[in-house]
């Protein structure tokens, strides 16, 4: 029950966040090449952790705000298993563009889920005070016209 409530809160927050006007600028000018590489690496590392069912590692790439919402790595991984199957067990992942929004960088990925359907994953990134990048949320949309 707690996981379902947390998932609903996270999904509602992401929906509200996305409903605001966003500035979409390809390849954010305020991000250095090392920042862009770090963002890619953080997301790939979390995807790799999901493949290993390494809850602690996957959880470590989430921002403190996200970690606080789920309480521990086990709850976080359970939420991903239930609500984000395409990124939990993707058949394929292709990194697309990194766009700048008024809420921060959004790394777009094209994912083929285990069901064979195509999805677009938006990874919202946040730079921490120590200079590292962490995942501040993810939302998925299904590409209705693309099945594999």
Which residues make up each language-model segment?
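Bacterial N-terminal signal peptides that target proteins for export
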Residues: 1-10
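Short solvent-exposed beta->alpha transition segments
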Residues: 30, 37-41, 55-102
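Short, low-complexity N-terminal intrinsically disordered segments enriched in polar/charged residues
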Residues: 23-52
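Bacterial N-terminal signal peptides
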Residues: 9-19
């Amino acid at each position: 029950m707690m996981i379902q409530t947390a998932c609903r809160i996270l999904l509602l927050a992401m929906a509200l966040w996305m409903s605001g006007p966003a500035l979409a600028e390809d390849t954010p000018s305020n991000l250095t090449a090392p920042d862009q590489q770090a963002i890619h690496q953080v997301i790939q590392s979390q995807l790799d952790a999901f493949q290993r069912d390494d809850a602690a590692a996957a959880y470590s790439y989430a921002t403190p705000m996200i970690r606080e919402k789920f309480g521990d790595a086990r709850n976080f991984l359970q939420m991903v298993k239930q609500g984000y199957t395409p990124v939990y067990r993707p058949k394929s992942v292709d990194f697309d563009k990194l766009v700048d929004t008024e809420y921060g960088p959004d790394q777009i990925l094209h994912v083929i889920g285990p069901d064979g359907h195509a999805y677009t994953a938006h990874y919202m990134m946040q730079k921490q005070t120590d200079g590292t990048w962490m995942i501040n949320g993810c939302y998925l949309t299904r590409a209705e016209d693309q099945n594999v």
